[in-house]
Amino acid sequence: MLRIADKTFESHLFTGTGKFAAPEVMVEAIRASGSQLVTLAMKRVDLRQHNDAILAPLLAAGVSLLPNTSGAKTAEEAVFAARLAREALGTHWLKLEIHPDARWLLPDPIETLKAAELLVCEGFVVLPYCGADPVLCKRLEEAGCAAVMPLGAPIGSNQGLETRAMLEIIIEQATVPVVVDAGIGVPSHAAQALEMGADAVLVNTAIAVADDPVTMARAFRMAVDAGLLARQAGPGARSTQAQATSPLTGFLEALA
């Protein structure tokens, strides 16, 4: 079980809602993934209408919604968007995203920390998307964020855990859940993240753009479960030298 703030999740796989060919495919993929927490870009839905083509099926599916501030370029814009989402959706949960450069979509660390401090004071459960910076993640944790969401690689790049060395430090020092977000391109990337100690992963593009999103969602579900189970089983230590699995000379001595 994974606990973040006031909610508990059985699934360690969070999913997004962007890039799907149709809302029906999105909902079917989310169900196949087993995900219980789904991010929702506020700029893509009509928050005033709960019969919105994206919002309505998500509400019907019974998943927890995590509105995000994607599109915000400053702390002020993010805080404004967060307040709108809370009023419209009735949730104080928020994925904080601030990326001023549309080409790279890298999170702005200064504006993110500034917004996080303000939103925590307003009672939001803040899950900030951030760079894989151990110092920043610790500062966000100290500011009161309920979890941290460092990137594995740039959003939508499918490059995998390019920031692995920094992620390991973040995981080791964190006292809040660590959710690896962005860059996860195939199920094995998700399994690796859970194996190394991440509490969850957030996957969107890899599922949404697959030839068969529903089957890919199911594959990610299995990979996350496998990665978590492997970590709980206690993997053997890595070694720079070969380690024999059976005696090398015993049978020769027996023949002497």
UniProtKB/Swiss-Prot annotation:
Pathway connected to this protein: Cofactor biosynthesis; thiamine diphosphate biosynthesis
Which molecular-function annotations from GO does this UniProt entry contain? thiazole synthase activity
InterPro entries documented for this protein:
Aldolase_TIM (IPR013785), Thiazole_synthase_ThiG (IPR033983), ThiG (IPR008867)
Q: Which Pfam families match?
A: ThiG
List the GO terms this entry assigns under cellular component, sorted alphabetically: cytoplasm
TM stretches of this protein: none
EC number annotated for this UniProt entry: 2.8.1.10
Q: Which reaction does it catalyse?
A: [ThiS sulfur-carrier protein]-C-terminal-Gly-aminoethanethioate + 2-iminoacetate + 1-deoxy-D-xylulose 5-phosphate = [ThiS sulfur-carrier protein]-C-terminal Gly-Gly + 2-[(2R,5Z)-2-carboxy-4-methylthiazol-5(2H)-ylidene]ethyl phosphate + 2 H2O + H(+)
User: What SUPFAM superfamilies does this protein's entry cite?
Assistant: ThiG-like
Q: Where is the active site?
A: 95
Q: Name one GO biological process term.
A: thiamine diphosphate biosynthetic process
Tell me the residue numbers annotated for binding 1-deoxy-D-xylulose 5-phosphate: 156, 182-183, 204-205
Query: What are the entry keywords?
Result: Cytoplasm, Schiff base, Thiamine biosynthesis, Transferase
Q: Where in the cell is it found?
A: Cytoplasm
- State if Cell membrane is listed as a keyword: no
Entries under PANTHER family matching the protein: THIAZOLE SYNTHASE (PTHR34266:SF2)
Family per similarity comment: Belongs to the ThiG family.
Q: What does this protein do?
A: Catalyzes the rearrangement of 1-deoxy-D-xylulose 5-phosphate (DXP) to produce the thiazole phosphate moiety of thiamine. Sulfur is provided by the thiocarboxylate moiety of the carrier protein ThiS. In vitro, sulfur can be provided by H(2)S.
Quaternary structure and interacting proteins, as annotated:
Homotetramer. Forms heterodimers with either ThiH or ThiS.
Instruction: Tell me which HAMAP family the record gives.
Output: ThiG (MF_00443)
Official protein name in the record = Thiazole synthase
UniProt organism field = Klebsiella pneumoniae (strain 342)
Upper lineage ranks? Bacteria, Pseudomonadati, Pseudomonadota, Gammaproteobacteria, Enterobacterales
The protein's gene is named thiG
